C-alpha cells in the first residue's frame, strides 16, 4: 500500500504507522501502533493529515473509522476503511456467514459451534466428507483456518480450538463444508453506494512447498489472475459485491 500510494503525484508526505524496513524506503515510519487511536489522533492533528488508509484488520474491527468520524476535531480526515460494524464481515466468521445467508450470497454449508455445543459440532462433522474445514470465529492474523484430511483429526482439532488454541478468537468455531476449486481475492473500494473493483490477486497462504502445511497470513500473492476474466468477474459483481453493498436496491 505504501509503495503504491507514494507514487501518486497528489502525495506531499507519507507516514506509515508503525511501518517496517520496507516501508521506510517509500515514506517515514512512525512508532505508533495501528490500534493506538489517541496517539494516531494526536499525530494526525499535529501533522495536518488529510487521509488515513487502514491496512490491518485489527484497528478496523476495534473501530478506528468510528473513532475519527465521531470526534469533531478529526472528522474532516478521510479514513479509508469500514466502520466497526462493517468490519465484522472480517472480524467474525460467524457474522459473515449469517450475513451471506441473510442476503442470499453464495457460501459453503456450515455450523457455528461453542464449547457448550461441542457434541452438535462433532455430529455435524459426521455429515461432511473430507477434508474438513475449521475456522476460528475471530481474528488470528490469517492463521485461524485449519483444513484436516481425516475425521479423527478434525474432531481432535475442534476440541483443541474450543479449549483456547487461538484464545478468545476460537471461543466460537465455524465448521465449514470444503469447497474444491480455484480461489482468488477480490478487493473493492466503496462509499456505501458506489464501488470500484481493484486488481484481483491470488494469495498463497500455506507455509510449505507445493501449497502444503498450515495457513499463514500469506506467503506471497500474484496479480493479475488469469482465470478472473470478464465473465468470472461479472458473476462476482452480481452475486457477491452488489448484494453486499446493497446496490441492487438502488438501481
Predicted regions and their residues:
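Short, charged, surface-exposed secondary-structure boundary motifs
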Residues: 25-26, 88-94, 208-210
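Conserved phosphate/anionic-ligand binding catalytic regions in large, soluble enzymes, centered on
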Residues: 212-223
